[in-house]
């Protein structure tokens, strides 16, 4: 069950959702819960790059680390801030692993156990560093590698 708090879309622990992508991150399949939270119609999501839901406040460095691991064949778990098609934000705890010819990402509600608050704080600091680098002309991808 989803609710709205400020600009954030909240959902319940029972809302487990997934998507599959090809090796380049293009969405091949998604369940209805994902489509509902992402606020994009299936026709728009299937065939789109997964970064269609990427939030600008999500540190590029986190995605760099995630891609490094999954491309090396290691599963990865991370807290991820997404932006829905209606402009609202939603946080997930994503578990991503390789499957034949692509990846599967299973997402759940982040636990409110103190870790999530710490992650949000760290992400904010990292994103501030990335923005400062961007102001100095460093491309986002390059800043993420530092």
Where are these regions (language model features)?
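Signal-transducing coiled-coil/dimerization helices and immediately adjacent hinge/linker segments
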Residues: 128-146
């Amino acid at each position: 069950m989803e609710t709205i708090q400020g600009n954030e879309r909240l959902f319940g622990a029972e809302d487990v959702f997934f998507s599959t992508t090809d090796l380049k991150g293009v969405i091949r399949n998604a369940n209805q819960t994902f489509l509902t939270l992402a606020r994009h119609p299936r026709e728009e999501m299937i065939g789109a790059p997964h970064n269609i839901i990427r939030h600008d406040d999500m540190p590029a460095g986190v995605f760099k680390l995630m891609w490094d691991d999954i491309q090396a064949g290691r599963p990865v778990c991370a807290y991820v801030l997404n932006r829905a098609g209606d402009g609202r934000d939603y946080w997930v705890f994503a578990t991503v692993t390789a499957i034949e010819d692509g990846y599967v990402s299973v997402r759940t509600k982040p636990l409110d156990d103190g870790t999530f608050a710490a992650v949000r704080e760290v992400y904010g600091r990292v994103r501030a560093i990335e923005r400062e680098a961007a102001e100095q002309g460093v491309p986002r991808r390059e800043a993420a590698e530092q």
